[in-house]
Amino acid sequence: MREPREHRPDLMSVAASRPGTLAGPVVFWAGERARRHQRGAAVTVHFTYLSGPDVDALAMTDEEILGAVEGGLVAQGRGQTVIEPRVHLVPDPAYRGHFNVLRGYVAPLGVAGMKIVGDYVDNYLHGLPSEMALLNLFDPRTGMPVALLNATAITDMRTGAMTALGARHLARRESRILGHVGARGSSYWNVRLLDRFFRFAEIRVHSRRPESRWAFGEHLARDLGKPVRVVDDWETCVRGADIVVEASRLPEPAPLLRTEWIAKGALVVPYGTMSALELSLTDVMDKLVVDDWGQVRAGRFGALRAHVDAGRLTEATLHAELCQIVIGDRPGREREDETILFWHRGLSLSDIALGHAMLEKARRLGIGQSLRYA
């Protein structure tokens, strides 16, 4: 990683206001803090907490979401980040779920972060979302906590932004048909942000449970102000679509998305935890793009895990990471007839960048709580 520029972010703060408020902090930089410690002076440290309702109250716009995630990609492309590959915790296979732990550092923002997200496929039976997350932001110079955010919405928003930004560089500009499989939390943001770029003439959606896909379709139609076609099977959803997004929630890998359904010149964006792809899918691709090669080349989960293990997706067959395309180091789509696959596993950098943007907006609006840490 390149040596970061000097930053003096307002990160390690000593509260100058009463607990429970978000008034401006008094900042002690590391040297001054050490001198105070040597003099025996007590240092009181608070961090900001943003709950789910707080995050909702921020009313993040599409532009704010896309801008934050794109900023993270630019920093990644310029070598101004540190990404540690995600790790997993499976408490008990009988629970049909696991935890993902994502870690990273974004130098231009002067913040490091760690997100823990639970991924439980049967949570709908308990009236709970399948994915629930917490994001911790830290001062990278001292390790002191800066903020704790409910990151469930962050996960959904940044995933949709990554899908849409990938498509902006990799899909045909005249793409008019979207086929979207899956109705998980991030699915809404996939479709919403993709439609912002492409203004689709036809949007098809499918998911395993009828009640889920119909509710999803109605939600999209209401918010987008256009018809959404709810279909009963994968083939009807996928065949002939200009952009295909596979965001299914399978309990185990199963080749439900057939290679023969993919149209020449299409963009395919698979990111289900359990693979729904045939091994032959990579054979019809002109370009393979990922969010971070270091992250996708190892691990136990992911849409193209079998393709990596079988040697079909390697560093040699990889065209680029999306960040390289965003900053112009590598080309995106070059021909109308190119068939392209973009696999994103989910970047810690996107969580950190969007979480940081939310924290800054919360400070401007006076949203959130200041909690005592030390």
Indicate residue ranges for each PLM-predicted region.
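Intrinsic-disorder-associated, low-complexity terminal segments enriched in Asp/Asn/His/Tyr and depleted
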Residues: 7-10, 37
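Residues in the short beta-alpha loop(s) of Rossmann-like NAD(P)-binding domains
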Residues: 184, 208-209, 274
